[in-house]
Design a protein with these regions (language model features):
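A structural signal for multi-pass alpha-helical bundles of membrane permease subunits
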Residues: 2-289
Length: 289
């Protein structure tokens, strides 16, 4: 009876998991082995691994993967460093206006990604935006929407959006440290840097692993920012395959290739899960040292 009672509490979340995650995943998996175009699945034919073979020879797909990989390697460390620095500053108790600082730092995360991207897109404008005013005042020719710096500009938007979110995770982790450790360190004559190095940073290892995994998943799912900026950048700087998610979206809804888009989504899910698993294993090894 106790097991049955426990199962009843798990039932709602299991139903949500099956309906929202498991069924769509299995449906996409089935689509990826057919020639389904998005109209009538009854007419779809089984094609085996043809979609996956095509995908592994698709230069546009690998170009998109390489772009988000570069984005992840550069943007995630910068964002998490800023988040950790802000959390340490808040936890130091030496920062005036702590509540205001915490709320204002988290506020960008509460702004919808579409709105954030539009705001930054207008500021990036070389003619009428903030960058345009800067160019007019200093006589420069800075263009934040040019193809050479576009990925960095998108990274700046994402960093602005999610630094506060990660900061709260770090700050929550620091808040669990007993004050007795700080008192003992002060009695021993430890400096502020020694306290950070020996007490605070080790405490951040667990939360760092979580934020890294979430950030990697978010980076590989990059869609909103480049999609919104697509109509704001000159020329064809943001292509339909700029990121894997944009490529899958355009294949499915514009190209009537739901089967190929499903195969792409499955491969990206496997890649993302593999990277997240490796990060988690490394984190567990570090915590066991």
């Amino acid at each position: 009876m106790e097991n049955f009672a426990s199962a009843r509490f798990l039932l709602p979340i299991m139903v949500v998991f099956i309906v929202v995650i498991l069924i769509p995943f299995l449906q996409s998996l089935v689509f990826s082995f057919t020639d389904y175009s998005g109209y009538n699945f009854a007419d779809a034919k089984f094609v085996g691994f043809a979609n996956y073979i095509r995908l592994f020879h698709d230069q546009q797909f690998w170009s998109a993967v390489g772009r988000v990989a570069l984005f992840t390697v550069v943007q995630v460390p910068i964002m998490l460093f800023l988040a950790a620095a802000m959390a340490l500053a808040l936890d130091s108790m030496k920062l005036h206006g702590t509540k205001f600082f915490r709320i204002s730092t988290f506020l960008p995360y509460a702004v919808p990604a579409v709105v954030s991207t539009l705001i930054w897109g207008f500021m990036y404008g070389a003619k009428y935006g903030l960058v345009g005013s800067f160019n007019g005042f200093f006589g420069t020719h800075l263009d934040m929407l040019s193809p050479s710096v576009l990925l960095a500009s998108i990274g700046n938007i994402v960093t602005w959006e999610f630094t506060g979110y990660n900061m709260l995770i770090f700050y929550s982790s620091l808040s669990t440290i007993p004050h007795s450790l700080y008192e003992a360190a002060s009695i021993d004559g430890a400096s502020e840097w020694q306290i950070i190095k020996s007490i605070k940073l080790p405490e951040l290892k667990g939360s760092l692993a979580i934020t890294v995994i979430f950030s990697i998943i978010g980076s590989f799912q990059l869609f909103n920012e480049p999609s919104i900026l697509q109509n704001m950048v000159p020329g064809n700087a943001i292509t339909t395959y700029y990121t894997p998610n944009m490529y899958a979206y355009n294949l499915s809804f514009s190209g009537n290739q739901s089967n190929y888009a499903a195969a792409l989504a499955i491969v990206m899910a496997v890649i993302t899960m593999a990277i997240a698993y490796i990060v988690q294993l490394n984190s567990l090894k570090e915590q066991m040292k």
